[in-house]
Amino acid sequence: MKKYMCFSLTIIFLSLIWVGCSNTVSSGEDENTSWVFVANEGNYGASDGSISMIDEFGNVYETESIGDVVQSLEVYNNKLIVLVNNSHKIKIYAITTEGISMPGIEISTEGSGPREMVVVDGKVYFTNWITSDVKVFNLFTYNIEASIPVGSMPEGIISDGTKLWVANSGEDTVSEIDITSLSETRHIVGSGPQNLVKHNSDVYVSRTYYSDDWTITYHGASRIVGSEITINNYGSGGACGGSVLSHQSDVYRSFDGGLARMDAELNLEERTIGNYNQSHIYHVEKINGNFWFAITDWNDLNEVRVVDSNGDELFTYKVGQNPGDFALWEQID
């Protein structure tokens, strides 16, 4: 694998001190035109969650602490939307080529425990563990305008523009919601649904669940094709983030230190893209054709590794505490 050196860069900007690392440093004549944002959860209960920002030249900047458990983030137009789980709030920042506006706008979710989100036509649909629902936040009025009851501990959420699919991680169901009527249909997919991806017309689900005494972790995957459900239980194993994503003509799931292709019966191939300690892989996303791995040991190891489709490691970035979700912003001419 190719590996690149990473060094520290400290930048003071206005009243904030941003500390990061980079693989390259841009010249003063080049203008940055993109950002990859990283949600650094921080330590639970410490309110030290932050956002790392990686520019197109590989420079990394980190914001000040913004709350307790920075769970997920999305880009919509020139806005960065952030869900802060244990602070029960939404943060919204304006994005420019120079970064994000601080301190941003803050909206309380009234103790709901927000988790994951999708944005459709100016509305943020986000899951909530404590209230067991999907709330609808309007990006024009800045109001939460609806709440859709779903199953226990809703986690991952995806949309095709007309429907939502929600993984109810505290049980064995996925909720399918019509965006217009907000009506819900539940599909039984097996224990512990976590993350979802739509591939062609099918919805794939990664699952992670536990023994009654929480000492054994089990993994699996499911597929929803209309009303037909395929379920495959993989058995027990090490901790697994359970990412699932579409790549070319196939669907991949995080497994055994990388990403493994799933066959028609949802079995996982032994060959993987990426080769890391499985217990350190917290999240994986595909950005501009490459795979971005959030790597953490919940202590001093907090990195993002970027890997191409051949499994070659392209970049390593040092980021904030306990990195998870990613979001891409690109300047539109």
Task: Tell what function each PLM region has.
Residues I11:
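Short, charged/polar micro-motifs that form catalytic or ligand-binding hotspots
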Residues I17-G20:
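C-terminal motif of bacterial Sec signal peptides marking the signal peptidase cleavage site
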Residues S22-D333:
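Predominantly soluble domains enriched in secretory-pathway, periplasmic, or organellar proteins
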